[in-house]
Each structure stands twice: as C-alpha cells, then as structure tokens.
C-alpha cells in the first residue's frame, strides 16, 4: 500500500531538489539569513539543523559527512569556526523562520530563515526630543495662558447705501 512521504517535492526532480536545498543551506551558513519561499525555508531548516548537529561533533568524519551536502569550502570553514562556536551549548533549534508578506509577482508565501544566535535586532535611530514650534520657527512667539492674541480690531465696512442697492447692474 502506498504511503505518503513527509518531505515536500518543491516541484523538482530528486537531484534538482537536493541541489536546491544544498545551495540554500550553503547560503544560509555563509550569510546567516536568507529570504526564500516558506516551503523552501521549511525544507532548508531540516537540512541545516542536521548539518549543525553533525558539526557539533567536530570530527573529521563529521566534516566529510557534511561535505556531501555542502560542497563549499568557505561554508565549511564558517560552519566549523564561527557557527559551532556560537551554538555549541544549544541543544537544537538553530534556525528561525519568520513569515513575510506574499511576493508581489506571484503571491508566493515568503519567509526569512536565519540562524538564531546570529540574528541582529534592527538598531533604531535615537529619536530627537520634540521641540516646541516656537523654538523651531525663527522669530515666533509662544502664546501662553488665557492671554488673547494681539490682533488689531478690524473696522467694519460701510453699509450699502439705498441708491447702490436700488441701482441694477447694467450690462455692457
């Protein structure tokens, strides 16, 4: 009887899928954070978690096993040097997936996958203290309390005379 396999096929052949996941894993190790589709991120997480767990052993055999999946020497150096040093005491859960808004072109579900210990919080610029408008606008005066503004009263306009009201406008 046919059984369902738990992995996503990602619309690729087996070799293409393996190459895609290898490439995504390599880039994640090198850059610590990548943006991809949600399905690829979830499959990449499985691969990277296993790779980092093997790397924590630190043996030559582990290096050779990992080199089967990641065929990039720089990524291997980064993995065994930088990554293992930071996640050495963590028992698992080395990656985090953050969902993003859908991609504009095809509305594919997007996500960011990142290594947890390398996630940097965005640095917010310190907000400048809000100044009073009087200090910002040169030469202005701030009105305080119940003081009425210093505005001169406008004299009322003279009312229309009866002659002006009776005279119809002539068409010229």
UniProtKB/Swiss-Prot annotation:
GO CC terms of this entry: cytosolic large ribosomal subunit
Membrane spanning residue stretches: none
Region listing for Disordered, in residue ranges: 127-172
Gene Ontology biological-process annotations: translation
Low complexity bias locations: 147-159
Chain intervals with Basic and acidic residues compositional bias: 163-172
InterPro entries reported for this sequence: Ribosomal_bL17 (IPR000456), Ribosomal_bL17_sf (IPR036373)
Single GO molecular function: structural constituent of ribosome
Keywords, sorted A to Z: Ribonucleoprotein, Ribosomal protein
Protein's UniProt keywords contain Ribonucleoprotein: yes
Subunit and interaction comment: Part of the 50S ribosomal subunit. Contacts protein L32.
Database matches in PANTHER family: LARGE RIBOSOMAL SUBUNIT PROTEIN BL17M, RIBOSOMAL PROTEIN L17
Protein family per UniProt: Belongs to the bacterial ribosomal protein bL17 family.
Protein's UniProt name: Large ribosomal subunit protein bL17
Organism: Chlorobium luteolum (strain DSM 273 / BCRC 81028 / 2530)
Taxonomic placement: Bacteria, Pseudomonadati, Chlorobiota, Chlorobiia, Chlorobiales
Gene designation: rplQ
